[in-house]
């Protein structure tokens, strides 16, 4: 089996599917964090928060998660802010979507394109895609939001037209 973070072979059979060095680099902990919610709840919350606009924009279901870094049992949870990770679970509409996103991001890394830290993580219903948030600077007293670019900007689309590309419609006149 290969590491779900770096893709290199694991030296020993490991339940987490991650190298210890990858866990430390990605999460800053010595143990792989557990996801505190079951997959049914995860999918329900991801759908609700995406539809209500309470999460990172996009058409794919996703959740913003906070790392509670208890040294004995680190966990990713919905409570507490600031959020430091984005989790994208499996979806019924598209088979292996998290694995596909991980593949594309790994290919971008290999091509020398700068990407956010990304990996796969095990859940009850299979693998989920996880990425570190890089659109915020976190300090002890505030959260500074940073401007970020995305692939829709390559098509010269305005923010309000971001999702019309998924419907194969024309962008708004400029």
What are these model-derived regions, one by one?
Residues 1-32:
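Regulatory N- and C-terminal appendages and interdomain linkers associated
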Residues 5-7, 14, 36, 74-82:
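Short, compositionally biased low-complexity segments
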Residues 14-23, 38-47, 84-89:
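Short low-complexity stretches enriched in small and charged residues
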Residues 30-49, 55-56:
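N-terminal charged segments
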Residues 38, 147, 165-166:
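A diffuse structural propensity rather than consistent per-protein peaks
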Residues 48-159:
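Conserved ATP-binding subdomain of kinase catalytic cores across diverse folds
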Residues 158-167:
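A short mid-domain helix/strand-loop element embedded in enzyme catalytic domains
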Residues 168-174:
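Conserved small/polar residues in nucleotide/adenosyl-binding loops
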């Amino acid at each position: 089996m290969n590491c779900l973070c770096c893709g290199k072979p694991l030296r020993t059979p490991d339940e987490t599917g991650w190298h210890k060095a990858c866990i430390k680099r990605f999460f800053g902990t010595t143990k792989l964090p557990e996801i505190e919610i079951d997959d049914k709840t995860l999918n329900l919350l991801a759908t609700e928060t995406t539809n209500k606009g309470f999460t990172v924009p996009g058409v794919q279901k996703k959740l913003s998660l906070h790392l509670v870094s208890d040294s004995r049992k680190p966990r990713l949870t919905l409570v507490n802010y600031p959020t430091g990770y984005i989790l994208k679970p499996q979806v019924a509409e598209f088979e292996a979507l998290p694995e596909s996103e991980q593949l594309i991001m790994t290919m971008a890394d290999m091509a020398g394109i700068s990407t956010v830290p990304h990996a796969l993580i095990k859940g009850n219903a299979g693998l989920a895609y996880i990425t570190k948030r890089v659109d915020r600077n976190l300090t002890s007293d505030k959260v500074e939001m940073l401007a970020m670019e995305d692939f829709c900007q390559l098509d010269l689309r305005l923010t309000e037209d971001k999702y019309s590309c998924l419907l194969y419609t024309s962008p708004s006149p400029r």
